[in-house]
């Protein structure tokens, strides 16, 4: 990389040398001020000389600040032929940058000239000027705070002069003291000082934007003397001197030699090494005293000590704290009260287990190194037999048969505590009653009782884990000195969810009462497990579940309720809350052939526990049931269709719009009146001739005219008669015509006969012949013949029925009676027509 950089620089220098006339000699930059306030505007101009013949006649001058091109340059040609570009930077926000005047040369910018711009602030006034006279170096050291950063090279100078007064009159000047770069302190040597005479001192700060001076300080160098701290050490023990008292330290120090001729005072500070205690200040120490006994300290405790001094009573400065000295105080005999309790073994009553607890009588009761249980035999003055020496809070020993009392003491290197007598007596006092216990929180138990009569002097309370973890060696006990107490809150060695045995014994003068015990849980636990679910019965949409409740557990809170949860395959959850006495539950509303996950939660006031998950699937519907359901559905659909059809058929206003009422001769009931072929010959009634034709109507065939019964404006159309008659074909109905019939749409006339009569009025019947152009049903039919009334052959009375006068002009009777070319009509009565 270094070689590559050197080659690049070499090529750049070579290219510049090869440029014609050297472009760098063509331009020159001038600025309004190279150093300005940060954020102030600055104006610069660049002039290109006329003798740069290798440039364009009108070169474009560009400006660049650092690496960024700056727009806004104003370019013009001067009278002497030179090109000038002027730019104004409104805000110079760079503390240091290069402004360049450039031209486009090829594909790159060629710098014609550049100038360095600086921006910053004028120096602030130096403050907190202070000076100290160091006797070790014999120099006056002054220091100050320079103020905020100026971003410009700033020089500081410590100036001073001598003065015989209060520095109002300036005397001889003292050589300026210039600190090193970056330092804010300076030393004036002793040769430039005049001791015991005032001098004026100040600091001057200067940079390119201005100058500032600190307030003047007037002082005597000896008034600002700072001494060096003395050397602190412990006092050597002397055979004649008494040993130091407990909690005391004997100290001495060696003063600083150059300051022996200066009057001074000192002070001491100390703190214990253990913990995070703060310094405690002791002083001032006695004048001209080089040793001191420091008391009131904790015994058998390590301390850290330091000392410092100051010129006194004249002005001066405190010295620094001396190096630390570590000392340990002496011990004191334990000052404690020992609360004792004892228990005899059942198998060996002379084996006694003694317990005790030290109770400090003072804030500093002394360190305890161990305990001694001793017995003084009667009749042996001064003889003490130790029974037990231990550092524990209990001891098991064999009690001599004649011993009824032992002594217990605590000891350390400084001595022993006051002996505590322990009297072994039988339980002859009254017992307390109604002992009870309850948990206050997971880490405490409240034990209460009713005191006996007379009041005891105190109580001994023991507690420890109950069965099956009971152990006499792990019991905790304490003594309650208040004989009128009715309860006590146990906080020591209490853990949650544990069964504890609590024993309370009343203490009397020279005796004690019988012990009473009670069991209690520090905190009841939630059920350890929930009952297991079992499937009893299951159907398509239901499932019957059952479970066996768990038996009550010691230390477990009683159940308050059950909650059963079931979840389907779509992860939809359902739940139901049941009483604690429930033994089963039926799930309803299940989906057939569906998978469900079910679990039971047993809850109490202490918490809840879930059972294992039971997975079941409901039954699938059988095939017969499915067929029944489909059959019922089909029957219902059929009934619906039938009802709809009947409704449409029975309602004329619904039927007529769907299809027209066009008669069908082939399926008409008229066809049943006359057989299709008559085997017998037609006979005529004797004595009767051809009935006269009373009226003939000729109908012309016209497709554009409506049928006669559909026309409402024809004068020939009238209402239907009260009695409908029949048409009779005159002639032999079996005769077959050999004449071909014209096709439909011709002008051939078809003759119709109309028989008019009335059942109520006797008289001869009337025939009505009509000419019709209506097309026949058959393609080719024989020509119409005369009509013969066959009614006379079937009439039992042999009389003719005459038509009603109002029916003589009727020729059209509706769509059911207008059938062309009927072979024969046999009237069997009016009842047949009534069915129409």
Curated annotation (Swiss-Prot):
InterPro entries: FN3_dom, FN3_sf, Hematopoietin_rcpt_Gp130_CS, Ig-like_dom_sf, Ig-like_fold, IgC2-like_lig-bd, Type1_Cytokine_Rcpt_Type2. GO terms for cellular component: endocytic vesicle membrane; external side of plasma membrane; extracellular region; lysosomal membrane; plasma membrane; receptor complex. Glycans are attached at residues 51, 93, 128, 134, 389, 474, 579, 610. One of its GO terms (molecular function) is cytokine receptor activity. It comes from the Eukaryota. Residues 651-836 are cytoplasmic. Disulfide bonds join 26-52, 46-101, 131-142, 167-218, 177-186, 248-295, 266-309. It is a single-pass type I membrane protein. The chain crosses the membrane at residues 628-650. SUPFAM superfamilies: Fibronectin type III (SSF49265), Immunoglobulin (SSF48726). It is found in: Cell membrane. A motif (Box 1 motif) lies at residues 658-666. Gene3D superfamilies: Immunoglobulins. Residues 125-230, 233-332, 334-430, 431-528, 530-623 form the Fibronectin type-III domain. A motif (WSXWS motif) lies at residues 318-322. Keywords: Cell adhesion, Cell membrane, Disease variant, Disulfide bond, Glycoprotein, Immunoglobulin domain, Membrane, Receptor, Repeat, Secreted, Signal, Transmembrane, Transmembrane helix. Coiled coil: none annotated. The WSXWS motif appears to be necessary for proper protein folding and thereby efficient intracellular transport and cell-surface receptor binding. Receptor for granulocyte colony-stimulating factor (CSF3), essential for granulocytic maturation. Plays a crucial role in the proliferation, differentiation and survival of cells along the neutrophilic lineage. In addition it may function in some adhesion or recognition events at the cell surface. This is Granulocyte colony-stimulating factor receptor.
């Amino acid at each position: 990389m270094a070689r590559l950089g050197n080659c690049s620089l070499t090529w750049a220098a070579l290219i510049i040398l090869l440029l014609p006339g050297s472009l760098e000699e063509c331009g020159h930059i001038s600025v309004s001020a190279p150093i300005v306030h940060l954020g102030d505007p600055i104006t610069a101009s660049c002039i290109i000389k006329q003798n740069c013949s290798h440039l364009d006649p009108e070169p474009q001058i560009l400006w660049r600040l650092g690496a960024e091109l700056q727009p806004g340059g104003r370019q013009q040609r001067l009278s002497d032929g030179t090109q000038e570009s002027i730019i104004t930077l409104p805000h110079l926000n760079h503390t240091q940058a290069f402004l360049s005047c450039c031209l486009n040369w090829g594909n790159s910018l060629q710098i014609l000239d550049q100038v360095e711009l600086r921006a910053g602030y004028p120096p602030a006034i130096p403050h907190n000027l202070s000076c100290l006279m160091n006797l070790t170096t014999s120099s006056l050291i002054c220091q100050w705070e320079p103020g905020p950063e100026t971003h410009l090279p700033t020089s500081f100078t410590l100036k001073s002069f001598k003065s015989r007064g209060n520095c109002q009159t300036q005397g001889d000047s003292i050589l300026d003291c210039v600190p090193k770069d970056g330092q804010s302190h300076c030393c004036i040597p002793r040769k430039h000082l005049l001791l015991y005479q005032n001098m004026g001192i100040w600091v001057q700060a200067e940079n390119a934007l201005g100058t500032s001076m600190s307030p003047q300080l007037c002082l005597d160098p000896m008034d600002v003397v700072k001494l060096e701290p003395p050397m602190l050490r412990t006092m050597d023990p002397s055979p004649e001197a008494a040993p130091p008292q407990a909690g005391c330290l004997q100290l001495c120090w060696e003063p600083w030699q150059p300051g022996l001729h200066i009057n001074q005072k000192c002070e001491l500070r100390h703190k214990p090494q253990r913990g995070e205690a703060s310094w405690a200040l002791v002083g001032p120490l006695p004048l001209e005293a080089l040793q001191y006994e420091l008391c009131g300290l904790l015994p058998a405790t390590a301390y850290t000590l330091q000392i410092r001094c100051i010129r006194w009573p004249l002005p001066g400065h405190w010295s620094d704290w001396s190096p630390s000295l570590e000392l340990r105080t002496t011990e004191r005999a334990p000052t404690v009260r020992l609360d004792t309790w004892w228990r005899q073994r059942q198998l060996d009553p002379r084996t006694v287990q003694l317990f005790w607890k030290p109770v400090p009588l003072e804030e500093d009761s002394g360190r305890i190194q161990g305990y001694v249980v001793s017995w003084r035999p009667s009749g042996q003055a001064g003889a003490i037999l130790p029974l037990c020496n231990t550092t524990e809070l209990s001891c098991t020993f064999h009690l001599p048969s004649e011993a009824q009392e032992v002594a217990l003491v605590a000891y350390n290197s400084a001595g022993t505590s006051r002996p505590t007598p322990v009297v072994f007596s039988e339980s002859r006092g009254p017992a307390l009653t109604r002992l009870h216990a309850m948990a206050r929180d997971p880490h405490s138990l409240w034990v209460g009782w009713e005191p006996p009569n007379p009041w005891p002097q105190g109580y001994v309370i023991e507690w420890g884990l109950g069965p099956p973890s009971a152990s006499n060696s792990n019991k905790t006990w304490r003594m309650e000195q208040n004989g009128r107490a009715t309860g006590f809150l146990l906080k020591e060695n209490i853990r949650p969810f544990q069964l504890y045995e609590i024993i309370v014994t009343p203490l009397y003068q020279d005796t004690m009462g019988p012990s009473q015990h009670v069991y209690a849980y520090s905190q009841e636990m939630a059920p350890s497990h929930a009952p297991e679910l079992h499937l009893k019965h299951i159907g398509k949409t239901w499932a019957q579940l059952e479970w066996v409740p768990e038996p009550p557990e010691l230390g477990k809170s009683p159940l308050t309720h059950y909650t059963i949860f079931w979840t389907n395959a779509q992860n939809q959850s359902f739940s139901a809350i049941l009483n604690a006495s429930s033994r089963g539950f039926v799930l309803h509303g299940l989906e057939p052939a569906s998978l469900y996950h079910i679990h039971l939660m047993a809850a109490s006031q202490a918490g809840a526990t879930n059972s294992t998950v039971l997975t079941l699937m409901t039954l699938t519907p059988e095939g017969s049931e499915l067929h029944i359901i489909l059959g019922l559905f089909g029957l219902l659909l059929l009934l619906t269709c039938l009802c709809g059809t009947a409704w449409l058929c029975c309602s004329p206003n619904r039927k007529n719009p769907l299809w027209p009422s066009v008669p069908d001769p082939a399926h008409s009931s008229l066809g049943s009146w006359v057989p299709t072929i008559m085997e017998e010959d037609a006979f005529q009634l004797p004595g009767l001739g051809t009935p006269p034709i009373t009226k003939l109507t000729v109908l012309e065939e016209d497709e554009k005219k409506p049928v006669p019964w559909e026309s409402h404006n024809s004068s020939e159309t009238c209402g239907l008669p009260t009695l409908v008659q029949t048409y009779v074909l005159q002639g032999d109905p079996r005769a077959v015509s050999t004449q071909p019939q014209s096709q439909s749409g011709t002008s051939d006339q078809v003759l119709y006969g109309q028989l008019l009569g009335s059942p109520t009025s006797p008289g001869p019947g009337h025939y009505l012949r009509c000419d019709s152009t209506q097309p026949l049903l058959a393609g080719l039919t024989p020509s119409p013949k005369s009509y013969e009334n066959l009614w006379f052959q079937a009439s039992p009375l042999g009389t003719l029925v005459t038509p009603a006068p109002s029916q003589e002009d009727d020729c059209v009777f509706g769509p059911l009676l207008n059938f062309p070319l009927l072979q024969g009509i046999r009237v069997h009565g009016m009842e047949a027509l009534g069915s129409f």
